Each structure stands twice: as C-alpha cells, then as structure tokens.
Amino acid sequence: DSIVDEEVSQRLEQVQMAEREIVLEEFREGLGLKGNTLAFLRSQYKDSYLVYQISSKYLFEPILDVPMADYSDGEFVTDEKTKLKSFEVDGKSVTSHVVDVSKYQGDIDWKAVKNYGIDGAMIRAGIRGYGSGEIVADTNFDTNMKNALAEGLKTGAYFFSEAITVEEAKEEAEFLLNAVKPYKVKLPLVLDLEMIDGDDGRNEKLSKEEMTKVALAFMKEIADAGYQAMLYGNIRTISEMVDLTQFEDYGLWFAYYSNEIYICLLYTSDAADEARS
C-alpha cells in the first residue's frame, strides 16, 4: 500500500507541476498580448474582481452584487475628428457628451464647446479644503453656469467633499443647493469624493462605514430638494471609501482614464481643450 501511495503522490505532484507550467505559460502569453500587467489581470478577473494599481501594488476587490451596465468596447463608436465615444443602439447614438469644469480651466469659449459636440457641463460649485476644512466657492462657477446655459447646454454641478461628519455633509449639500438655485439645472448634483494621497486628507481617517454614512447624508439632502443626486469617484472611491451597495438609489459617475472600456464614464481630460482661451 505504501508503494501505491507513493506512486499516487508522485503522479499528483507531476500533474500539479504540469498545470503550474501551463498557467505560467498562459500568463506570459497574456502579458505579451495585452502589453501590460494591469490590462492582463483585468481581463482574467473581469467577472469576479475589480483590479487596480497603487504604486507597484495590484489590488483586487470583489465585484459587488449591484446593477451593472453590459457595455462592451465593440458597441462604442469613436468620432475620428473629436475622439468622443458614443454608445449606439440600432446604429443611433444614445450618448450625451458632458464635460466637467472648474476655475482651473480658465476662461472657456462655451460656443466652441457646443460646436465640438458637447451636450452638457458639470460645473464645480466649490470645495471643502482637505487641510483647513473650510468651504470655498469656485470663483468661476457663476460665469461658467451662465455662459454654458446661454449656449443651450444642459448643466449640473458638483462639490469636492472633505466632510467627516453628517453635519458637514449636510452643510456641503446646502452650499451646492444654494449655488444652483438661480439656474435651471437639469443634470445631477454631485458629491465629488476622492482619496487624497498622503496624510493630508481629512476623510481618510474615517472607516468605510463612517464615510458611507457621511456621503449618504449629502445624497439625501440633494434628493429631498428634488434634484438627482450622484456620487463621483474612481475605483478607490467605490472599493475603499464607501459601500457601493448603499448607493443604488443614486447616480454614479466613474472617473477612469483609458482607451479600453473597463468601468468607464469619464474617459478623457482633453476633449474640450481647444475651447479654452
């Protein structure tokens, strides 16, 4: 029996080594075809994990049980002149192209933005400083809002949050509501929630549960005022900062810069550069 057991063990070890070599070979071939490690890992775990990279570390977050879009690269058409992507159904675009702007874009020629093929604009109303914690208005908000509306663009607005309490989140929502009150805003009002690198971010000290509670307080204030509330963030926002399953009643705006569709809505920062003066 011991001889049989030894032979079985040897055979199992040989099979395991052979399978390991097959996996490694597939990995090497995949890296060669995809061109980079991150793209390959995403292709391998697309149905089970969100994969992202922080410095030299690859992180894997289980995909949550939330409603998902079923877009694929093949269903997007890219305009050769503007490079804007459109999602088509039966050969017709069902996409709205929207830019987001703040004072950092300077003086914007909104007529040029409109002519470029842009349908709307998300305009920054203000921020809470991640160091001071003070709310600061975006100095170009009113100018951008008035001029975008004058060109017939739909508009929405966003606020960069560093709230660490429910009370601060409500204060930010009230600030945003007051900012848009004079205007006919048809697009969502957005909580911009991002992780600040380093130790400067106020909200980095919060747990995911605490941050989720704070963000939801903002959302509720906006929704109760009759607007569509939306969360803005990148992969780290939805995987590390908040529990995404708690936001199914609200809009979600992903920041993801790549030519390859992954979980992408915001896909370029250059579309309307030529409209800046």
Show which residues each predicted segment covers.
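Aromatic/hydrophobic pocket-lining residues that form π-stacking "cages" and hydrophobic walls in ligand
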Residues: 144, 218, 268
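Generic helix-packing signal
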Residues: 152, 180, 219, 275-276
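Substrate-binding cleft of extracellular glycoside hydrolase catalytic domains
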Residues: 95-115, 122-214
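Boundary/entry segment of secreted carbohydrate-active catalytic domains
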Residues: 3-116, 124
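Extracellular/periplasmic catalytic domains that process cell-envelope and extracellular macromolecules
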Residues: 90-94, 114-117, 149-151, 182-185, ...
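Generic detector of short, locally flexible boundary/turn motifs and exposed helical patches
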Residues: 60-67, 84-89, 121, 154-157, ...
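Single conserved hydrophobic/aromatic residue that forms the stacking wall/gate
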Residues: 267-276
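Catalytic domains of cell-wall/extracellular-matrix polysaccharide-remodeling enzymes
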Residues: 185-265
